[in-house]
A protein has these predicted regions:
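Short, surface-exposed secondary-structure boundary micro-motifs
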Residues: 9, 30, 64-65
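Short aromatic-glycine-enriched beta-strand elements
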Residues: 19-27
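Short, structured beta-strand/loop micro-motifs enriched in basic residues and often containing a Trp
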Residues: 37-45
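C-terminal structural segments of small proteins and small subunits
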Residues: 60, 66-96, 100, 105
Length: 105
């Protein structure tokens, strides 16, 4: 699962019958460094959205086979799925010491 920011919507002229009544949004993923800065920096992607994410919303999304999991046992043509709307993202930097223990900075 990754975190991204919605930057727009997609309008379809035709859609698979099993996908009617839902939206598609354009999202830009965050790298860890971008999360610290609050600016997305990944490549735009189209995400299936049944939660109503709007422009500027931060979302968590799954991709690939996991994106279709919420519809099981139905088969849906989905490659990226908006799993939740995020109110806040807090990045706490952690490092692993030589002996494998995690420390916070």
């Amino acid at each position: 699962m990754r975190i991204g920011e919605v930057i727009g919507t997609v309008t379809l002229s035709r859609v698979h019958p099993s996908m009617t009544g839902f939206r598609w949004v354009i999202a830009v993923p965050f790298s860890l460094a971008a999360l610290r800065e609050g600016k997305p920096d990944g490549e735009d992607l189209v995400v299936f959205d049944s939660l109503g994410a709007g422009a500027g919303s931060k979302i968590a999304f799954s991709e690939g086979g996991e994106a279709a999991a919420p519809f099981h046992p139905e088969r849906k043509p989905v490659d990226a799925y908006c799993a939740c709307l995020l109110d806040q993202v807090v990045v706490t930097e952690q490092r692993t010491t030589d002996n494998g223990q995690r420390t916070k900075r």
